[in-house]
C-alpha cells in the first residue's frame, strides 16, 4: 500500500504489521482495515473499516469464547463471561494492538487530521476498532480457522492472565468486587486534568474508605480511572 500526501502520519511499510499478524493480507483489504472513518470523511467519503470491525468483533468473540469453554469445563456461564470480559474489551484490544509490528498498529492507521492532532494513534477506542478490523480482514481472506489461530496467538498472554485477574483488564469491576468482599465500600475516583482542550491528559486517584490507593493517567477519564483502579487492586491484594 502506497501512502499519499494525505497519509503523512501513517507508515506505508506494513511488513512488520503483517509479520506480527502471521498471515498475509491483500493490499486493498489491508488498506480498508486501516482506514478510520475520520480519514474517509476527509477524503471524499471513502469506505471505512467499520464493516470489517463488525465482522472482526464476532470472530474475536467466537474464538475466545470457544477456547474458554473448552479450557474451563468447571466454570459456570457467569464465570466464563467474566473471563471473556478480561480479553474481549477495549483496553485488552488496545494492548494487543500496541504490540503489533514496529510502532504498533497505531503507526499504520489512516486517520483524519483532527484525530491526528488529538493523539488518535494511541486512543484505546481507535486501536481496539482497528484490531477488530484486522481480524475481520484475516477472516475474510483466509477463513475462520486461520483467523481463530491468529486470535489465539495474539491473545495468548491475556488468556493466560485472565483467570488470575478477576474481571481482568476491566479493573474497575475487579476492584469493586474486591472491596465488596472485604466490606470496604464502593471505590470513588478523583479526576484532574492538564493540557489544552485538544490534548488533555487526565489523572485519576482511587479513593477507598477515605484513603487514596492508586493513581492512573490517560487521555480520557475512563482510561485514567481504569489504570487507577488497577493500581488500587494491586495495592489491596498486596496487603492481604
From Swiss-Prot:
Q: What are its cofactors?
A: Mg(2+)
Say which domain of life the source belongs to. Answer: Bacteria
Source taxonomy = Bacteria, Bacillati, Actinomycetota, Actinomycetes, Mycobacteriales
Q: Which EC number(s) are documented for this chain?
A: 3.1.26.3
Please give the catalytic activity noted in the UniProt record: Endonucleolytic cleavage to 5'-phosphomonoester
Kindly provide the name given to this protein in its UniProt entry.
Answer: Ribonuclease 3
UniProt keywords (A-Z) are: Cytoplasm, Endonuclease, Hydrolase, Magnesium, Metal-binding, mRNA processing, Nuclease, RNA-binding, rRNA processing, rRNA-binding, tRNA processing
Organism of this sequence: Nocardia farcinica (strain IFM 10152)
The entry's function note states: Digests double-stranded RNA. Involved in the processing of primary rRNA transcript to yield the immediate precursors to the large and small rRNAs (23S and 16S). Processes some mRNAs, and tRNAs when they are encoded in the rRNA operon. Processes pre-crRNA and tracrRNA of type II CRISPR loci if present in the organism.
| Keyword hit for rRNA processing | yes
